[in-house]
Amino acid sequence: NKKIIMPDPYKLLKKIKNSPGTIESKLAYELGNPKKKAVTNIKNRYDGGEWGIEQDAPRHVTTAQYTTESLRNKLPFGLGNSIMGRGLAAFGANVLGAAHEAKAGYSSVKKGKSSVKDAFLESVEDLTNNFAGSVVGAFGNSNMDNSKNKKIDKIIKYLPDGKYKSKL
């Protein structure tokens, strides 16, 4: 008789709060570092490992995909494969993406790297890409691997590049 234990979100939040690092880095660790895995995936797929601006959109899509898949895997009793669980995971990934964009946009404006308008419009593009990735992550397997690369490569050409600069 194996006892099924429900995950305790309060224990997880307490663990995140008490560990070193930013809230974002702590959450990333708990989710299996989806951005780090996405960056590795993208570097291997584009430009022979060199980082370029054209990789921003696929990085956002793939990071959101992996975040959604990780959240699906965290749901108890196999709920991550239910319609409700897939939707909750995609919603959660978009909330986390929006929090990241708010932080990144604020930081960029504060440091003088971009105007409020540029930061806002770039965030909108990134959130569009995050949404697409969360949809990809909500369907099919939840392996956090490169099995969905072909799907992402097909949709990426219809998405914004994720970089915005006002014309001077």
Language model features by range: what are they?
Residues 1-5:
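Short, Lys/Arg-enriched N-terminal segments with co-localized hydrophobic residues
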Residues 6-121, 128-131, 135-168:
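Bulky hydrophobic segments
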